[in-house]
Structures are given as C-alpha cells and as structure tokens.
C-alpha cells in the first residue's frame, strides 16, 4: 500500500512516477524499499491513467455498513458449525476399534 500512496503523492505533486522518485519518497517515510516491488509498481502505473482511476473511484458507490444484529447472529452460526465438526471428528467408538483389533488376533 505504501508504494501506491507514494505514487499518488508524486502524481498529486505533478512529478514523474519513476523508480528513483518513488524510492526517495519511501525512504523519506522510513520504509525499506523492495526493489522488485518498486519496479513492478512503476511498470504497472506506466499503463494507467491515474486521473481517470481517481475520477472513477470517486464515482463508485460506497457499501453500506452491516447491521449490528447481523453480527450477533454470526457467533451462533459459528458455534453450530463447530458442534457439527466435533460430531464428524468423533469417528468410530472404542468398542468398534476393539472389535476390529480382536478380529486381527482370531
């Protein structure tokens, strides 16, 4: 994310988004720079019209936050899933295992 933020900072300052410029911004922010990621971001952004992306992002509808009641129902559903998993994990009883072993010894 830092690489994108640094790129947006350079873009808003009307500076070229180059490897050196991006590296300088990240270093100034105290972030250790990964050269591979740096090159990938610069290469990817060369093909992107950042102004167009920002305009489209501003026009996108924002998702409505979930209702508090829905979060209360989730733990109950999770507990049911856990109970089902426990039932499935039980497997054969000790008696079934013992009878299986007894058949091995005649």
Curated annotation (Swiss-Prot):
It comes from the Archaea. Residues 77-93 have a biased composition (Basic and acidic residues). Part of the 50S ribosomal subunit. Homodimer, it forms part of the ribosomal stalk which helps the ribosome interact with GTP-bound translation factors. Forms a heptameric uL10/P0(P1)2(P1)2(P1)2 complex, where uL10/P0 forms an elongated spine to which the P1 dimers bind in a sequential fashion. Residues 66-76 have a biased composition (Low complexity). This is Large ribosomal subunit protein P1. Forms part of the ribosomal stalk, playing a central role in the interaction of the ribosome with GTP-bound translation factors. Residues 66-106 are annotated as: Disordered. NCBIfam families: ribo_P1_arch (TIGR03685). GO terms for molecular function: structural constituent of ribosome.
């Amino acid at each position: 994310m830092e690489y994108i933020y640094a790129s947006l900072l350079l873009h808003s300052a009307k500076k070229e988004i180059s490897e050196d410029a991006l590296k300088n911004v990240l270093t100034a922010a105290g972030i250790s720079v990964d050269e591979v990621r740096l090159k990938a971001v610069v290469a990817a952004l060369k093909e992107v019209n950042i102004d167009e992306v920002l305009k489209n992002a501003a026009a996108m509808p924002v998702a409505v936050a979930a209702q508090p009641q829905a979060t209360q129902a989730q733990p109950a559903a999770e507990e049911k899933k856990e109970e089902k998993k426990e039932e499935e994990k039980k497997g054969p009883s000790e008696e079934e295992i013992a009878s299986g072993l007894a058949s091995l010894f005649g």
